[in-house]
């Protein structure tokens, strides 16, 4: 059975939790290394999610470069 993809937001929350744990003074070197490795994996997943979103946007926009017009209110 296919695994459901995690959202970018849920990956970000996990990464923030890891960062907070690594910033604590109570974590061991081994724990820091484990968290660092997990953080790198999360960053790679997040990068992939962003790349997929960018590809979908390009398809929807017909690969046309358009200038963003924001709302300056």
Swiss-Prot record:
Keyword Hydrolase: yes
Superkingdom of the organism of origin: Bacteria
InterPro entries: Exonuc_VII_S (IPR003761), Exonuc_VII_ssu_sf (IPR037004)
Keywords: Cytoplasm, Exonuclease, Hydrolase, Nuclease
EC number assigned by the record: 3.1.11.6
Membrane-spanning segments: none
Gene Ontology MF annotations: exodeoxyribonuclease VII activity
Record GO cellular component, one term: exodeoxyribonuclease VII complex
Cross-referenced PANTHER family: EXODEOXYRIBONUCLEASE 7 SMALL SUBUNIT
Subunit field text: Heterooligomer composed of large and small subunits.
Family: Belongs to the XseB family.
Protein name: Exodeoxyribonuclease 7 small subunit
Origin species: Clostridium novyi (strain NT)
Encoding gene per record: xseB
């Amino acid at each position: 059975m296919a695994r459901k993809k995690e959202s970018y937001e849920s990956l970000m929350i996990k990464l923030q939790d890891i960062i907070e744990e690594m910033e604590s003074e109570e974590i061991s070197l081994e724990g820091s290394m484990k968290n660092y490795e997990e953080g790198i994996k999360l960053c790679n997943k997040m990068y992939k999610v962003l790349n997929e979103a960018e590809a979908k946007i390009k398809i929807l926009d017909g690969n046309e470069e358009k200038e963003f017009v924001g709302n300056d209110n």
